[in-house]
């Protein structure tokens, strides 16, 4: 009978926290309203009115897209913090595993690939429809490059590597550029 290998709990929780930050950033970005082709001519009047939620910086605010853009940027940055900690904690506790490496890459794909790309699309609502198509294409290429980068990292990296050097641009750095733009966007708007 094959023995089941235990999962390192604390590093895995940090990796999952990274994943949750990315997922929540996508949810927050999805609440940013972008004008449609009809909305340029006719404003939408049938908006659902939910009970009033007090303004808290980590709560989605449907009426304030700027706050949602900033929250999305902050969640991506928070995901970077969890991503920086999970590998270090696993190595310090001598609990590194292939499972952890794969889970980390999947979490990174969501937090540093899909979430920044979706944020990029939602931050460009006033572009004409021809330009919005280009934004979607650029965002799609960004996600594909993130997936390829993470797959390459998983294939090239061995257990003995100490991860002290890196070939190419790390995905958190690319995501930091987009998240940083979102945070600067807030500073310029206020």
Residue ranges and their predicted role:
Residues 1-84:
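Topogenic membrane-insertion module of multi-pass membrane proteins
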Residues 1-5, 65-71, 94-100, 130-137:
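Short juxtamembrane and helix-loop transition motifs at transmembrane-helix boundaries
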Residues 5-11, 105-190:
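A feature for the membrane-embedded catalytic helix bundles of lipid/isoprenoid biosynthetic enzymes
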Residues 16, 23, 27-30, 92, ...:
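Basic, gly/Ser/Thr/Pro-rich low-complexity segments located predominantly at protein N termini
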Residues 27-31, 86, 91, 120-124, ...:
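Membrane-water interface at transmembrane helix exits
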Residues 75-118, 152-155:
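Acidic (Asp/Glu-rich) catalytic motifs at the cytosolic membrane interface
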């Amino acid at each position: 009978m094959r023995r089941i290998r235990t999962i390192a709990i604390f590093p895995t929780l940090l990796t999952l926290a990274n994943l949750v930050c990315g997922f929540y950033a996508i949810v927050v970005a999805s609440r940013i309203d972008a004008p449609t082709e009809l909305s340029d001519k006719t404003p939408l009047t049938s908006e659902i009115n939910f009970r009033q939620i007090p303004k808290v910086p980590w709560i989605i605010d449907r009426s304030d897209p700027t706050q949602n853009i900033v929250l999305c940027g902050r969640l991506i940055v928070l995901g970077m913090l969890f991503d920086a900690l999970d590998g270090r904690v696993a190595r310090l506790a001598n609990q590194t595993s292939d499972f952890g490496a794969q889970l980390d890459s999947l979490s990174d794909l969501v937090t540093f690939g899909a979430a920044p790309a979706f944020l990029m699309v939602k931050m460009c609502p006033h572009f004409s429809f021809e330009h919005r198509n280009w934004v979607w294409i650029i965002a799609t290429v960004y996600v594909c490059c993130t997936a390829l980068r993470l797959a390459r990292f998983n294939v090239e990296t061995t257990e003995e590597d100490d991860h002290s050097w890196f070939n190419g641009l790390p995905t958190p750095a690319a995501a930091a550029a987009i998240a940083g733009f979102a945070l600067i966007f807030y500073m310029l708007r206020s």
